[in-house]
Amino acid sequence: MIKTFRHKGLKAFFDKGSTAGIQAAHAPRLAAMLRRLNETTNAQGMNLPGWRLHALKGRDLKGYYSVCVNGNWRLTFALEGTDAVLVDYQDYH
């Protein structure tokens, strides 16, 4: 279950369906990813074809995971037990 968001636009999209804070073209894929993230209990639940799940590296990124939305855009998250926390939507390359 998703507990917390880092990206306000992504939270509004998840809660209300508003695309104001995200790339509108990414909405269908983000919706599928957020549904799956809300239902899964571990990172491997996000390991679907084309999503390119991987653990992030770096001192400050230990415990974070990323899936590819489109191009450079990623959905990143950490897990606290079986809950997703600090869910973010970012162009990080």
Regions found by a protein language model. Name each.
Residues 1, 9, 18, 42, ...:
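Glycine-rich, flexible loop/turn motifs
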Residues 1-33:
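Arg/Lys-rich, positively charged N-terminal/basic patches that mediate binding to nucleic acids
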Residues 8, 12, 29, 44, ...:
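A broad, structure-centric signal for solvent-exposed, well-ordered loop/edge residues
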Residues 23-50:
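Short, solvent-exposed, low-complexity loop/linker segments
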Residues 41-65:
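A short, surface-exposed loop/turn module that caps and links secondary-structure elements
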Residues 56, 60, 65-93:
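Enriched for short, Lys/Arg-rich terminal
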